[in-house]
Amino acid sequence: MKKGKRIVNSWNEWDPLKHVIVGRADGTCIPAPEPALDAKVPEDSDMRGKFGPRTKDTVDKANQLLDDFSNILVKRGIKVDRPTPLNFNQKTSTPDWESETMFGCMPPRDVLLTVGNEILEATMSYRCRWFEYLCYRPLLKEYYDLDPNMRHESAPKPRLTDADYRKDYLSDKIGIQKRLKWTEDKFFVTTEEEPLFDAADVLRFGKDLVVQHGFTTNLKGIDWLKRHYKNHRVHAVNFPGDPYPIHIDATFTPIKEGLIINNPQRRLPKEQRKLFENNGWEIIDAAQPAHNEPPPLCYSSVWLSMNVLVLDPKTVCVEKSETYQAEQLDKLGMEVIPVELRDAYAFGGGLHCCTADVYREGELKDYFPKQ
């Protein structure tokens, strides 16, 4: 890369993608139990009580899929960078807590939020992910050194003491109906002790940022984002049908200007739809997933089917086995690129999760002037 060049620029989820970070599966661990994580792991999950490194064969398979995905992007003229994995199978600590393991660096979308010429490191809300930003520092340093306009920012690191989490969430006896009621009432595992947010709870629509209030992002985190992005309008949204609301990109996915697919089990509430509808945007139900269950040892739901990566307003990457989602996007006029990734889902998510924007063509626009 040449010094003085504009390297970092991305204002939305659909402008032509030219430079991206794709995660790695090396050394990924199933994290040890901790307050935020216990609430996220479904009560009947085969991950309850397990922690430590994932098996070499599953890591190798996931890495092969991530490498293949990277090669698909490179062949389409997109520059791909990769993170530097840490030894995730080691104990970490701060003066407030200890964690038996870390997590991994397969999903950079969770950690890095690119808005214009700035890349922001999110606070994160899991103790096991507190040090994950280090995997991306070599890349961010390179961008900063070469791009005179690049801003590298980091949100205040949270203490993540027990005061950040509700103990009520830890019981195995809580049924799905009670969880859904809690979600409807916006009663989540995280308290309002300090600002918390994951980057994957934020969607970028030019001058507007749409942020999910849920397990991994609290209202103080959303307020911090409002203060930080002074030239943007920041909107809090929530999805009452999701008993485990974490990250917005398997629930609400912009495909191109004017069009969003929404998880039919987690519809955006009527009042919150006005921002989009008043400005001529269409919100349609996403197609059903092709699978009835997520892969083994996976945190995510079957709705990773809609966790797609838009390469430009006419082109989208969809997981190869998700035939219904591919068919829907094809009918909507998109060129669909099938990408095999299902065997890497357990390492941190789908095609959107495992990437983070560095550069998309385009400038800052106002897509919602009527507010």
At which residue positions do the language-model features occur?
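The feature marks the mature, well-folded catalytic cores of soluble enzymes
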Residues: 1-371
